[in-house]
Amino acid sequence: MTKIAFTGGGTVGHVSVNLSLIPTALSQGYEALYIGSKNGIEREMIESQLPEIKYYPISSGKLRRYISLENAKDVFKVLKGILDARKVLKKEKPDLLFSKGGFVSVPVVIAAKSLNIPTIIHESDLTPGLANKIALKFAKKIYTTFEETLNYLPKEKADFIGATIREDLKNGNAHNGYQLTGFNENKKVLLVMGGSLGSKKLNSIIRENLDALLQQYQVIHLTGKGLKDAQVKKSGYIQYEFVKEDLTDLLAITDTVISRAGSNAIYEFLTLRIPMLLVPLGLDQSRGDQIDNANHFADKGYAKAIDEEQLTAQILLQELNEMEQERTRIINNMKSYEQSYTKEALFDKMIKDALN
């Protein structure tokens, strides 16, 4: 029986692809295990949503693009992580490693290479992240979500596969969504998602604009951990820090979304044909990958995008109003998108690429 080790973490985006793939792997008769950090979000998500597979925590450092004394400490954490990962891989003897990226993945990929275990990397963003750039030297193949990403990668190692979307995405129950929120079925629903870390600025602007927004929408506000404001209570407005199992039901009642521009999330909105206003993480908080993703989706006619630095209460309302006027055009553009690979076909390709 083929055994696949999965790794990736640090953000929800670095875990969600694995969460979508592992159930398919298990249903096809593959064995699966997960290697991640000791305290990262990946541990919480994998252990709670896939308790049937083994989770192995390892030491991990953070990859920084700036000079810091912490970089020296993290070198030792990465070295320890390589040793930790080697122990796991020697014990489990997987046939291949699938790496979604994030800083925890680098020591695992290096350890796999030292044991001659082939690695397949997945890159969700338009431009490759630092972890995947490093890991690519030790990997056999890298799969991309965006076809344009191939321009940044060695031709012999890179293949475009499109987005991988979790199976339950389209199974959301609108009735359950309305019951959860207590919303009126005859009024539009706006979903606001600030990413796994939340966005204090976006949260502030939503609350500042709440009365105006509630004239047109009912609002589901995913604030991020620790960012709920218990003092804000209005009819047609509900806050959650983070939603797991119920998210598909909330998406089933969503008409419009305001969101960060992580690749996995925006491809889910695209699959569901939900018009989106994207507010990507700025260069002060990231390497600019979300800016690239947002601009790409805007250019394709799937979304509208605005830089967080330019975001004001007035501009938010203006952009939403313009998007509502273009709603039919946006949804028609979304209908042209087709998924490149089924998950079953992707695993066939993965096994062939890794083991041949």
From Swiss-Prot:
Transmembrane segments: none
Reactions performed catalytically: Mur2Ac(oyl-L-Ala-gamma-D-Glu-L-Lys-D-Ala-D-Ala)-di-trans,octa-cis-undecaprenyl diphosphate + UDP-N-acetyl-alpha-D-glucosamine = beta-D-GlcNAc-(1->4)-Mur2Ac(oyl-L-Ala-gamma-D-Glu-L-Lys-D-Ala-D-Ala)-di-trans,octa-cis-undecaprenyl diphosphate + UDP + H(+)
Pfam families for this protein: Glyco_tran_28_C, Glyco_transf_28
Documented EC number(s): 2.4.1.227
Molecular function GO labels: glycosyltransferase activity; undecaprenyldiphospho-muramoylpentapeptide beta-N-acetylglucosaminyltransferase activity
Annotated organism of origin: Staphylococcus aureus (strain NCTC 8325 / PS 47)
Membrane topology, from the record: Peripheral membrane protein
This protein's name: UDP-N-acetylglucosamine--N-acetylmuramyl-(pentapeptide) pyrophosphoryl-undecaprenol N-acetylglucosamine transferase
Keywords carried by this UniProt record: Cell cycle, Cell division, Cell membrane, Cell shape, Cell wall biogenesis/degradation, Glycosyltransferase, Membrane, Peptidoglycan synthesis, Transferase
